Amino acid sequence: MPSRCPGVAGPPALARTEGSEGSAGQSYHQNSKGTGEQHKAERIKEGHRMSSHTAKLQELWRTTQIQTIHIPKSMTDASFLKHPELTSGQKRYLCSIAKICNSSYLRTLMKRQYMHLFHHGLQKPGVLTHHRSHISSRYSQKQHSPCTTWRHHLEREDSLGIAAEAPEMIIHALWRPLRHKEGLKIGYASKTRCKSLKIFRRPGRLFLLPVSSKDYQPCMNDETKEEDLLNECMQSMSIQEQGSSHASLTVSCPTPSSAIP
């Protein structure tokens, strides 16, 4: 009798375990089915969104973009703009070429470039003047003259390094656009180029002397004369057509001897 009890009690326990496993499997199947349907719905929505986005892009691509092109009045009757197959970019390119070939625009560009170079040359930092004032302030208690200060300072034993660096500072401080045939030679500078110093170079020494206001007065006169000469050259510039395919630029400027006494 005791041996039959476990056998009788055994099948209901197995049935309960099988029932629990079946319910768990059914719930898992339902959950996986629900998540699969959600993913499918999300994919469908995203597909609709992408299709609508591509449709908008295609519509924008097909529609022509209207752009405003400003064409000068002197070029409206030009034959190269009346071609029916020209696009807006090609018309703009042709107008830019015609604008460059215009004499007034070319004159403006030349004057702007010249004035830019001229002002850039005047705004170069004066390294030598600053260096000189710094050294003279250090030795002002012993010597009163800046010239003697430079002489005594350069004649010292450690003057070789400063003498080697001085020509570079002179070039930076006195750099200007070339006006005439005279230029900065190695170790020398013309009187009209130097506003505040006279430079005398010897084989082993470098001397700097102050200059009066009369020496740099011709420099200002040269600047005004050059600007007047540039304006005369700009006014006499013209474009002459040679044939039907190309044009040449003719500039008639006065000689320097007649413009500058």
Curated annotation (Swiss-Prot):
Q: Which Pfam families match?
A: FAM216B
Q: Which segments show compositional bias classed as Basic and acidic residues? A: 36-49
Q: Give me the disulphide-bonded residues.
A: none
What ranges does the record list as Polar residues composition bias? 23-35
> Region labeled Disordered — which residues?
1-52
InterPro entries per the record? FAM216
Give the family from UniProt. Answer: Belongs to the FAM216 family.
Write down what this protein is called: Protein FAM216A
Please tell me the species this chain comes from: Rattus norvegicus
Its ancestry begins with:
Eukaryota, Metazoa, Chordata, Craniata, Vertebrata
